[in-house]
Every structure is written in C-alpha cells, then in structure tokens.
Amino acid sequence: MSPERERFLAITAESLYLANLLLAPGLGFLGLLWLWRRPDVPALPLARQHLRQTLVASLWAGVLLVGLSATILLIGGFESMWSWLAVILYFTFFHSTLVLCGMVGLSRAMAGQPFRFPLIGPRDRE
C-alpha cells in the first residue's frame, strides 16, 4: 500500500476525531469505528497509530466532557449558579484542549508523522 494511502487514512482518522468534537458528536465517532473495521488499516502502521490514538482520545473526551460535567451538576445541584459556572469553565477548558490536541494530530498526520495525545493517548505497544 502506498504511503499516500496510509497518510490519507491517518488524516481521515484525525479529521473524524475533530468532527466528533466540533461538528457531529457521535457521527464522527461512528466514522472512527467504521474506519477501525476496515481490513486494510492493520497493515498500515501510521494509519493504525493515528486511528488508535483518536479512538482512545474520543472515549476519554466523552468521559471528561459528559461524565464529569454531569457529576459536577449532580453534586452542586442544577439550580446553583456556581455549579453552572464550574461546568461552563470546566467544559470550555477541556474541550478547547482536546480540540487543540486534535489539530496538532491532524498536522502531524498531514506531515506523515506519528502523534500521541498527551496524558490520554495510549502508548505504542511496538
């Protein structure tokens, strides 16, 4: 398989990650799962690495954004303005950070280089 095809799949994985965060939550993740099921991806190390990173980062993003925001609201109460302030600040900070990491991952995929998400990205087994 050509390096261009491998780079294209890596770029697609990073683009779907960003689409999951910015444009179509859920649909982008389904696209990542569909891409993971493709038979040609395991043979392509760069595409496999980017796809694995984006899948794990998407799962962490769901836990960090939805799970912890809901926990803050449940603990603080839905009527408390301080709970909403905390949720808005928390969500804005983490969402921006995840998008920024996705942009760096996309630029690395476009350059044909590997990328690991800081803190939440899995380490390569190879």
Predicted regions, residues:
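Membrane-interface extramembranous regions at the lipid-water interface
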Residues: 1-23, 27-57, 103-126
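Hydrophobic alpha-helical transmembrane segments in multi-pass membrane proteins
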Residues: 9-29, 56-102
